[in-house]
């Protein structure tokens, strides 16, 4: 059922994209327009206008950013793949980047010509991206002869783990995924409604128990990172069935599957543990502190997911030059810091400026070795990166990262995984509810299209007035 809903939403999204491409008035100054498609609440919005000014300073050309947001990777992909939407810059997750590369939906970013252009102006900020992040991106599957780093540039990253209430759960308990199956916590557990982020760590946990039971691992031994990486590709019928059996056990204890409200449930102590992303965990921990609730976050010892979102230039992009400048602009350290401030997530940019920004001996008692992350382009660690006082939730130590792996696109097995996820959650919508969902998304998307067009025209009119005023001043 969930697969069907995703398909319906994707179809409506593709239709909306087609409407936008075909609407009159938008293409008049398309070459001076940059269409950006990003996750909601995932940028310092002041940077959008600042980019317009910076781009004109660097190139002598004007550009207007049309900024739109999405909440589901698959909806974004459907607009591009099926609707041929002409977004210039998009920010998908790692597994969608894999799929877009496989389906030849991406254009290269750092071309030799563009690199020479920005080097000549001394504004090449791509080197500020951590070599560790680039290494992780290189692990993404790509067609033979293609390097994922040529087609994607990292933006934000983090881990998947357990947020817990320290009053009811100890750190030792939270260091294992077994906590998710603790009957003592019945109706106090929330789980992120993101099947990939749940499937992978539970599979790692289940396989760990299997190998311990068979004697392949000792009682306290963990899987190797190589095995964990292999499991990130595993969507076999056997593994799907194994994860389903574990999730059905866990479901008996779960109070809810949450898309965003889990943070509030934790701060209000209506939930005691929540399987969630590190960025959301930091927000919840800070909010809880303000109301006297102590929350903490761990990445269980059995292993988990390290995730990445990155910038890409889709196949149907029009303004590729401005797109490349925009991605470069987002890699500028001061802009990366502002985006971290605005979103609560962690930028892939890791130079001396960022290291200084995140360091605070006053706020943190234990120094972390982040020399794996804060590295110069030549591979040498940045001075002081081996002893950093900072938030371990946002910046996990090497020991934590060494038990985390990147998720991969499951291709045509995705439907099987979605069907399993629906069975676990008990999705069972009536025809009437389905029709309601279809109508809701149709209306919202069409209204969104109309609103974007109207806003675009208003901004175009404002731009023309500004130009007229400028020309008038120049004459007088």
Show where each model-derived region lies:
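Bacterial N-terminal signal peptides that target proteins for export
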Residues: 1-9
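Extracytoplasmic/periplasmic substrate-binding proteins
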Residues: 252-316
């Amino acid at each position: 059922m969930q697969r069907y809903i995703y398909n319906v939403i994707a179809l409506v999204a593709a239709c909306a994209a087609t409407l936008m491409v075909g609407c009159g008035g938008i293409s008049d100054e398309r070459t001076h327009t940059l269409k950006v498609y990003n996750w909601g609440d995932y940028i310092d919005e002041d940077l959008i206008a600042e980019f317009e000014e910076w781009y004109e300073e660097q190139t002598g050309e004007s550009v207007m950013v049309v900024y739109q947001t999405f909440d589901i990777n698959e909806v974004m992909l459907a607009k591009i793949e099926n609707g041929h939407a002409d977004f210039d810059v998009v920010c998908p997750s790692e597994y969608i980047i894999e799929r877009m590369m496989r389906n030849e939906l991406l254009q290269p970013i750092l071309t030799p010509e563009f690199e020479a252009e920005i080097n000549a102006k001394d504004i090449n900020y791509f080197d500020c991206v951590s070599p560790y992040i680039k290494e992780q991106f290189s692990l993404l599957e790509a067609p033979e002869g293609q390097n994922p780093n040529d087609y994607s540039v990292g933006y934000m990253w983090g881990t998947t783990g357990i947020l817990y209430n320290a009053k009811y759960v100890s750190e030792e308990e939270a260091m294992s995924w077994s906590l998710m199956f603790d009957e003592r916590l019945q109706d106090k557990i929330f789980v992120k409604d993101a099947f990939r982020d749940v499937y992978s760590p539970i599979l790692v946990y289940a396989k760990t128990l299997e190998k311990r039971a068979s004697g392949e691992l000792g009682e306290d031994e963990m899987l190797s990172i190589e095995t964990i990486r292999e499991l990130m590709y595993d969507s076999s019928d056997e593994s799907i069935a194994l994860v389903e059996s574990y999730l059905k056990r866990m479901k008996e204890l779960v109070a809810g599957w949450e898309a965003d409200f889990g943070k509030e449930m934790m701060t209000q102590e209506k939930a005691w543990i929540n399987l969630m992303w590190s960025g959301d965990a930091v927000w919840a921990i800070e909010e809880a502190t303000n109301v006297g609730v102590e929350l903490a976050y761990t990445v269980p010892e059995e292993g988990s997911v390290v995730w990445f979102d990155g910038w890409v230039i889709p196949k149907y992009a029009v303004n590729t030059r401005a797109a490349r400048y925009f991605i470069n602009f987002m890699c500028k350290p001061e802009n990366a810091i502002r985006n971290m401030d605005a979103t609560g997530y962690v930028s892939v940019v890791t130079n001396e400026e960022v290291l200084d920004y995140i360091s605070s001996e006053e706020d943190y008692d234990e120094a972390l070795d982040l020399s794996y992350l804060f590295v110069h382009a030549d591979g040498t660690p940045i001075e002081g990166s081996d002893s950093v006082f900072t938030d371990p939730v946002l910046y996990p130590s090497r020991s934590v990262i060494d038990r985390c792996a990147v998720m991969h696109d499951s291709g045509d097995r995705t439907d099987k995984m979605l069907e399993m996820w629906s069975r676990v959650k008990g999705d069972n919508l009536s025809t009437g509810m389905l029709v309601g969902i279809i109508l809701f998304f149709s209306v919202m998307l069409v209204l969104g299209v109309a609103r974007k067009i109207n806003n675009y025209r208003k901004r175009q009119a404002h731009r023309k007035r500004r130009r007229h005023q400028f020309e008038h001043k120049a004459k007088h």
